[in-house]
Amino acid sequence: MFKILQYPDPRLKTAAQRVEKFDDALQKMIDEMFETHYAATNCAALAATQLDMENPKHITVIDFSPNKDQPLCLVNAEIIERSGEHTEEEGCMSVGGGTFEKVTRAAKIKVRARDRYGKPVEFEADGFMAKCIQHELDHLNGIIFLDRLSTLKRGRIDKRLGKLRRQGKV
């Protein structure tokens, strides 16, 4: 299992490396990512760059089903089409302190990726799945949802989180 990095850890700003080899080592990493995901409370998804690992790969694991029985692994994913806009509150496993803020993202997306075994996949997503994928792909590019907020809002959150860290609450 991996440790989930916490903001402001500078490794959260690291861009992931594309996956070139779909081997046993990759399968083990993906299994550990899902193990970490399922062990975390209220976790919808995780990107490799959120985890304490060397050379994080371009991988995200998603499962927000009630029984945690619908795992989705996206490797080298990219959004190839976007439409509409939707603004909704987001939180993040790497940003503690009960931090939720409104973020505007595409309402509908088309994704091209590979599954965990290297098989090409392409699909459309909307609603929570679209938001989740965009949030995780941001992570894989070194962007956290706080980066999408105004400077003023981000400053207030940084100040509040700093105080909580000093109190040992995050």
Swiss-Prot record:
One of its GO terms (molecular function) is peptide deformylase activity. GO terms for biological process: co-translational protein modification; translation. Gene3D superfamilies: Peptide deformylase. CDD domains: Pep_deformylase. Keywords: Hydrolase, Iron, Metal-binding, Protein biosynthesis. The active site is at 136. Its cofactor is Fe(2+). It catalyses: N-terminal N-formyl-L-methionyl-[peptide] + H2O = N-terminal L-methionyl-[peptide] + formate. It is an enzyme of class 3 (hydrolase). The keyword Iron applies. It holds the Pfam family Pep_deformylase. Its EC number is 3.5.1.88. Fe cation binds at residues 92, 135, 139. Binds 1 Fe(2+) ion. SUPFAM superfamilies: Peptide deformylase. Belongs to the polypeptide deformylase family. NCBIfam families: pept_deformyl (TIGR00079), PRK00150.1-3 (NF001159). Removes the formyl group from the N-terminal Met of newly synthesized proteins. Requires at least a dipeptide for an efficient rate of reaction. N-terminal L-methionine is a prerequisite for activity but the enzyme has broad specificity at other positions. This is Peptide deformylase 1. It comes from Coxiella burnetii (strain RSA 493 / Nine Mile phase I). The gene is def1.
